[in-house]
From Swiss-Prot:
Gene: ufm-1
Annotated propeptide span(s): 92-93
Listed InterPro entries: Ubiquitin-like_domsf (IPR029071), UFM1 (IPR005375)
Pfam families cross-referenced by the UniProt entry: Ufm1
Lineage of source species: Eukaryota, Metazoa, Ecdysozoa, Nematoda, Chromadorea
Assembly with partners or alone: Interacts with odr-8; leading to deufmylation.
Database matches in SUPFAM superfamilies: Ubiquitin-like
Organism: Caenorhabditis briggsae
Protein name: Ubiquitin-fold modifier 1
Glycyl lysine isopeptide (Lys-Gly) (interchain with G-Cter in UFM1) cross-link site: 77
Length: 93
């Protein structure tokens, strides 16, 4: 047996800012490295009371992030400071 099985799961911490609010509120979330980032996106959207299905996560530089990867991968590639954009205000009829 590997010693890793009994060790606590490593966590990563994200500071997620809601860009649609002029006050730029933010939430700090600590999640296991192996957590699917889609779950992090869904939880952050619920915390800000915006629809998760129409929200996106971007970096502070404006680069879109594909949420179909682990939280650990996102952290390593993009860092801890991210932005949540509710896309319900984009486009429309």
């Amino acid at each position: 047996m590997s010693g890793e099985a009994s060790a606590p799961a490593a966590k990563v911490t994200f500071k997620i800012t809601l860009t649609s609010d002029p006050k730029l509120p933010f939430k700090v979330l600590s999640v296991p490295e192996a957590a699917p980032f889609t779950s992090v996106l869904r939880y952050a959207a619920e915390e800000f009371k915006v629809p998760a299905a129409t929200s996106a996560i971007i970096t502070n530089d404006g680069v879109g992030i594909n949420p179909a990867q682990s939280a650990g991968n996102i952290f390593l590639k993009h860092g801890s400071e991210l932005r949540l954009i509710p896309r319900d205000r984009v486009g429309g009829f």
